[in-house]
Amino acid sequence: MSHEGQEELLDYSDSEEIAVPTTTAPSAAAGEGANDKEADKKGSYVGIHATGFRDFLLKPELLRAIGDCGFEHPSEVQQVCIPQSILGTDVLCQAKSGLGKTAVFVLSTLQQLDPVPGEISTLVICHTRELAYQIRNEYARFSKYMPDVKTEVFYGGTPITRDLEKLKNKDTCPHIVVATPGRLHALVTEKSIRLNNIKSFVIDECDKVLEAVDMRRDVQDIFRNTPHQKQVMMFSATLSQEIRPVCKKFMQNPLEIYVDDEAKLTLHGLQQYYIKLDEKEKNRKLSDLLDSLEFNQVIIFVRSTQRANELNKLLCSSNFPSIAVHSGLPQEERIERYKSFKEFNKRICVSTDVFGRGIDIERINLAINYDLPNEADQYLHRVGRAGRFGTKGLAVSLVSTKDDEEVLEKIQSRFDVKITEFPEEGVDPSTYMNT
């Protein structure tokens, strides 16, 4: 496995299993309008429980940062996971996109962190550079009142010498490392990173990281270079029965949290439709949708980097200013485009599945499957970009082949959801736009 330029990123017991029932509640921080700067400051989680974050007895610095983000009450996942995770319990958590899984490990690791110059205490592994970048930003905003805490992100496609410079200097060596498997494995192999003080070992989107044999081997090598006594936490929106035992081999008596286990695709407020048409009709239909539908930001999923580039060029030439993000771009360009879209410089993004997992951009409220994914689980990750926790959203899938029809059937069967045909009269904006 290459240690640089990773494109698709990212032996040890019985467990306690908890199934958390799904609960819905009105949004505590309703989504803002497209041009409302307040959206950058306010969180989008819904208050599920009466319990507030203060009841977790978190550090005052963390509570202050949480307040600045606009979060008042923990989500159901946070309510169950945080009290156990801050005690050092191993955690395996599966919950739908947008339920605040990232905040669980960010807050719990910061709560337990006692920064020592030159010592890495927390290691977070994820499968793409964009997700690593996003997790680093989450650490930055929750540790804003903890000035001694340093976080760095390491991923392939950038000069490894920059990583080495940061790691060998005690003043710049981070306490928290967020990394993709290939680059991290390269640093471990070259003995350029010291993991002997790791207290928290986290894998986000763990199924994606551990399903591929070569990636799993890299993670196992990294894991063996950490202390035996440490906390291990793994999170994903989808955890098949087959991958769970693999995850648990890294853990000791983990607390297992399965929210809506193998169950309904009930992303609160998400409207889902399909449109049957010929392949050659897709471009015209897409133009019609972008013309007729109201949206803050839209993400359009395609199956390949070539199709992403071609569709992006077509949209721009048709007066739909868009941006394309995919694994075929040079590393710096890819990150810059991701940042540009997140900062609302463009309202339309054409992407491959590199944006299909974990990426959280609050203003996205429309997801279009120009090409349907090959697997039902990937559909969940894609449409989860719209209608993030506590907000409304709309998902439209273009169905043009027999294979597409089979995938659509699998999605409805897998998640016990009814995806209806897009109505001729269109969709009422009030059903998917936040007021």
Swiss-Prot record:
Domain description: The Q motif is unique to and characteristic of the DEAD box family of RNA helicases and controls ATP binding and hydrolysis.
Alphabetical keyword list: ATP-binding, Helicase, Hydrolase, mRNA processing, mRNA splicing, mRNA transport, Nucleotide-binding, Nucleus, RNA-binding, Spliceosome, Transport
UniProt key word Nucleus: yes
GO cellular component terms, A-Z: chromosome, telomeric region; spliceosomal complex; transcription export complex
Domain Helicase ATP-binding: residue ranges: 82-257
Originating species: Debaryomyces hansenii (strain ATCC 36239 / CBS 767 / BCRC 21394 / JCM 1990 / NBRC 0083 / IGC 2968)
Protein name listed in UniProt: ATP-dependent RNA helicase SUB2
Family: Belongs to the DEAD box helicase family. DECD subfamily.
Enzyme Commission number, as recorded: 3.6.4.13
Swiss-Prot/TrEMBL catalytic activity: ATP + H2O = ADP + phosphate + H(+)
One MF term in the entry's GO annotations: ATP hydrolysis activity
Motif (Q motif): 51-79
Biased composition (Low complexity): 19-33
Enzyme class: hydrolase
Keyword hit for Nucleotide-binding: yes
Source species, domain of life: Eukaryota
Location(s) in or outside the cell: Nucleus
Domain Helicase C-terminal: residue ranges: 269-430
